[in-house]
């Protein structure tokens, strides 16, 4: 059962709330090809205490990923993107890393797409709990990262659900814009 329910007739999306269903706005990544399936991802904006992680520049400096800090990175906020569905831990971390570093722009749509929307099976709270591990996975030299974040914490500020388009093939799901494939098994 999906944690986000969609209605193709009225083009709305809902998730459970304390007093019933709450209307939400799903976002969709554009695609050059007609997708056969959309996989859901949580876009998680957070604030850090004990270390700096608000912008792209903060991420590059904190994790020491091999990128040059460019002027736009100083003012562009960084958010984590993690799968909103349960998968093997290795694949979860690989997808989280790939999508968090790629940072494609998702858009609101007036109508829900006709392609299948994969169910959201990972609650946002569980996705948020994974962020310290995802942050560690992003760092090429984890032993240098851990002293920087020791005693620090991440707090959620804003979350939203975003759907990434894929082409379904017999053995895998392909995301052409990111040149990425996910094995079905």
Task: Annotate each PLM feature.
Residues 2-185:
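Long C-terminal interaction/binding lobes of large macromolecular proteins
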């Amino acid at each position: 059962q999906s944690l986000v329910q969609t209605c193709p007739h009225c083009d709305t999306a809902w998730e459970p709330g304390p007093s019933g269903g709450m209307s939400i706005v799903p976002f969709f990544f554009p695609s050059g090809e007609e997708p056969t399936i959309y996989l859901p991802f949580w876009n998680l904006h957070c604030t850090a205490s004990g270390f700096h992680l608000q912008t792209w520049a903060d991420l590059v400096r904190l994790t020491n990923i091999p990128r040059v800090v460019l002027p736009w990175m100083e003012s562009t906020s960084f958010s984590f993107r993690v799968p909103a569905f349960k998968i093997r831990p290795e694949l979860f971390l690989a997808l989280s890393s790939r999508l968090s570093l790629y940072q494609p722009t998702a858009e609101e749509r007036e109508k829900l797409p006709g392609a299948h929307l994969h169910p959201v099976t990972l609650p946002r709270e569980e996705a948020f709990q994974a962020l310290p591990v995802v942050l560690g996975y992003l760092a090429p030299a984890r032993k240098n990262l851990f002293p920087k974040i020791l005693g620090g914490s991440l707090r959620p500020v804003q979350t939203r659900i975003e759907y990434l388009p894929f082409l379904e093939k017999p053995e895998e799901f392909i995301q052409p814009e990111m040149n990425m494939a996910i094995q079905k098994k």
